[in-house]
Every structure is written in structure tokens, then in C-alpha cells.
Design a protein with these regions (language model features):
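Class I S-adenosyl-L-methionine-dependent methyltransferase catalytic core
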Residues: 1-196
Length: 196
């Protein structure tokens, strides 16, 4: 009798195209090419994130730093963000973000900025300030160990430029100590293997 191999659900989720889990675009899949540089946020972590954010997404400008698949920014659009800015340095992945925007019919509400977002503290691009920002910082987790100065400089530069009423969400793995973030009333929510 042949043995049936069981697929770990988390591995299957990581290998399949991310889907939007709430809002007006719920159930729609994103353009995706499995790549070791891209780690889409797990559905349950994204659901918890948007439970925390709540209505702050409505009318906000979502800024998805380290966008990868764009799952976070497109989720924000689906849940009422007025527009989304995706920051992605890998050009083929940036092209997939543009394809996702077209297939979802939201290309008029999306801007893709290609380049290294960690250079923004030195050369901050022009960003709209006519609505509060909803900033997502979900980098490769090792950046908090290998590039902590760059990560904190990015966070400081964005916080300084942000309009009043903006919200910041940082995702790291559970080994990250949220006390390393600049003091300002951060809430830490462990959702293993991540912490928001």
C-alpha cells in the first residue's frame, strides 16, 4: 500500500500564490513567483495584523516597505486604504506587483517604487501627505540582526515624515526584542513565528 505524503499546511501556503483574506477583494489571488527573497506574511498573521489595525486602514495611504508579493499592501487596499505604495528592490518582483495591481483592477491606486528602501533615510522620496499613513515594515527577518542601524534609521525617517495620525506596524520573528524599537508606546503581539 503506498504511503501518502502529508504536506505541511504552512509549506503549502508559502508555495502558493497569496490571497487577499478580507475586504472588497477577498479571495483574489496575487501574482506570485516562489523566490527565497520573498516571504509572504502568513494568512493568520495578516488577519491578526488587520484585526489590530481595524478601521485605521480606511482612507489611509498604505506604504508596504519590503513589499515582496504585496500581500500586506493589497490587503490594506481591499480593506479601505485610499492607495498603496509598494517598495521593492527586486525588479522582477516589482513587475509582479504591477501585474497584481492590473489583475485586481486597482492600478490607479498603486505606485511601485523600485530600489532599496533602506536608502530612504539618505534620499527620502516624495510621498503624499494628504492622508495618514499605514506603514508596514516587514523585512527579511535577519535584517533586524544584520542591519539594525539601517532598520532603525528607516523607521525614524518614516516616522519623522509621516502625517499626523499615521500608524506603523513592524513584523519580525519572535527572537526580535520590541524594546529595540524607538520608545513611543509600541504594542507587541506574538503570533509565532512572528511578532507584530
Amino acid at each position: 500500500m503506498p504511503k501518502h505524503s502529508r504536506t505541511d499546511p504552512s509549506q503549502a501556503e508559502a508555495a502558493s500564490a497569496p490571497r487577499i483574506i478580507g475586504g472588497s477583494l477577498r479571495g483574489r489571488r496575487l501574482e506570485f513567483s516562489p523566490d527565497p527573497r520573498t516571504r509572504p506574511m502568513k494568512d493568520r498573521v495578516r488577519e491578526s495584523l488587520f484585526d489590530l489595525v481595524g478601521t485605521r486602514a480606511t482612507g489611509a495611504i498604505a506604504i508596504d516597505c519590503f513589499a515582496g508579493s504585496g500581500a500586506i499592501g493589497f490587503e490594506a487596499l481591499s480593506r479601505g486604504a485610499s492607495r498603496a505604495i509598494f517598495c521593492e528592490r527586486h525588479f522582477p518582483t516589482a513587475d509582479l506587483l504591477r501585474k497584481s495591481a492590473r489583475s485586481l483592477g486597482v492600478e490607479d491606486r498603486v505606485e511601485v517604487k523600485t530600489g532599496d528602501v533602506l536608502l530612504w533615510p539618505k534620499r527620502m522620496p516624495a510621498l503624499p501627505t494628504d492622508a495618514p499613513w499605514l506603514v508596514f515594515i516587514s523585512p527579511p527577518w535577519e535584517f533586524f540582526q544584520s542591519r539594525p542601524g539601517d532598520m532603525m534609521a528607516l523607521l525614524a525617517a518614516l516616522r519623522q515624515a509621516a502625517p499626523p495620525g499615521s500608524t506603523f506596524v513592524v513584523e519580525a520573528d519572535t527572537s526580535f526584542d520590541p524594546a529595540a524599537l524607538p520608545p513611543d508606546g509600541w504594542e507587541a503581539r506574538p503570533i509565532p513565528p512572528a511578532v507584530l
